[in-house]
Amino acid sequence: VLPFSAALEVLGYWVLGRIFCDIWAAVDVLCCTASILSLCAISIDRYIGVRYSLQYPTLVTRRKAILALLGVWVLSTVISIGPLLGWKEPAPNDDKECGVTEEPFYALFSSLGSFYIPLAVILVMYCRVYIVAKRTTKNLEAGVMKEMSNSKELTLRIHSKNFHEDTLSSTKAKGHNPRSSIAVKLFKFSREKKAAKTLGIVVGMFILCWLPFFIALPLGSLFSTLKPPDAVFKVVFWLGYFNSCLNPIIYPCSSKEFKRAFVRILGCQCRGRRRRRRRRRLGGCAYTYRPWTRGGSLERSQSRKDSLDDSGSCLSGSQRTLPSASPSPGYLGRAAPPPVELCAVPEWKAPGALLSLPAPQPPGRRGRRDSGPLFTFRLLAERGSPAAGDGACRPAPDAANGQPGFKTNMPLAPGQF
């Protein structure tokens, strides 16, 4: 729509014929109405998010969101299709003239359906959001939490609307923690409140940009004496277009989530891809460890899907503590040995005696080869002395005898190595 409107303003006349002029005018009303109704739907969504923050995922489902989007476009089509069906003023004799339909009753109908009714819904929803946010903030700030150490009871007191006290008590045996519950509620409410503030800015700019046009259009159509000059009408007409340029600026500046979404949509991820490739080159090798197999050993993993660089369980250039592997029943009751330090070097192979010793089998399972649990992890190569400037990875010397050793934080069962 916008390129054709710009061509009309620059050239001063319409060059695409009468039929395309009618289509352009209808599509212009369709897109503007869909934009305004979308803000109306978002305001309802924000009210639900603030009023029912904990129940929001169950109230607003994917299916309901799709139905809301379909409703927005169906209503927009109903409002905009009138001129294509003949509900318009007589066409001028000159095909080089083209503009929005100024038929009085259609102008009134489209103004009510496209702007004034959605605006009333938006204002009502935001008044409700403000009331709920103010009341909820006051109640959460006035809430008093106590912990009785002797009886191990947790008491949460929240002053509600009629200033009565609701006491919620639970014991540790039940595993319910009111403090964690109120923390979740505070987090969700603050997030929804911030989103509502962002949308409030958007709605404010929407009113400032569209209100002059929807005042000038119906008044100029119904009363010829109140029709504004062409220059004024063009200014208010393009002011409505300008609102669509503001929204992509307001959303990222007010919300990190929207900013990340815009960056992802625009495809500005080249820098992130380069960083990930650099981490893969410098981060060592991916290995697979099968702890309870007969002859359990460390194997070089060939699948990128098993690499912890993609799953976020390993950071390049630093060490991450790996979770301890649970021992088999055959090892229960034995004292856990100190962690063995391992280091994997791409060009250096560890002696086979260290990596291929058979692991003891749990009772009743001898003679069987059970794959057991699979642990995939990344052993980051340690650099040697500072003088080694070639970037090669060398084994770290063992603290006891100066021999090359390995380094990891995962404790191994006795007799595994």
From Swiss-Prot:
Question: Which InterPro entries is this protein grouped with?
Answer: ADR_fam, ADRA1B_rcpt, GPCR_Rhodpsn, GPCR_Rhodpsn_7TM
Topology in the lipid bilayer is annotated as: Multi-pass membrane protein
Looking at the Swiss-Prot or TrEMBL record, what is one Pfam family this protein matches?
7tm_1
Residue ranges annotated as motif Nuclear localization signal: 371-381
Q: Domain of life here? A: Eukaryota
Q: Map out region (Disordered) in residue numbers.
A: 295-331, 385-417
Q: Which GO terms describe its molecular function?
A: alpha1-adrenergic receptor activity; protein heterodimerization activity
Chief place where the protein resides: nucleus
Subunit architecture:
Homo- and heterooligomer. Heterooligomerizes with ADRA1B homooligomers in cardiac myocytes. Interacts with CAVIN4.
* PANTHER family linked to this entry: ADRENERGIC RECEPTOR-RELATED G-PROTEIN COUPLED RECEPTOR (PTHR24248), ALPHA-1B ADRENERGIC RECEPTOR (PTHR24248:SF17)
Q: What is the designated name of this protein?
A: Alpha-1B adrenergic receptor
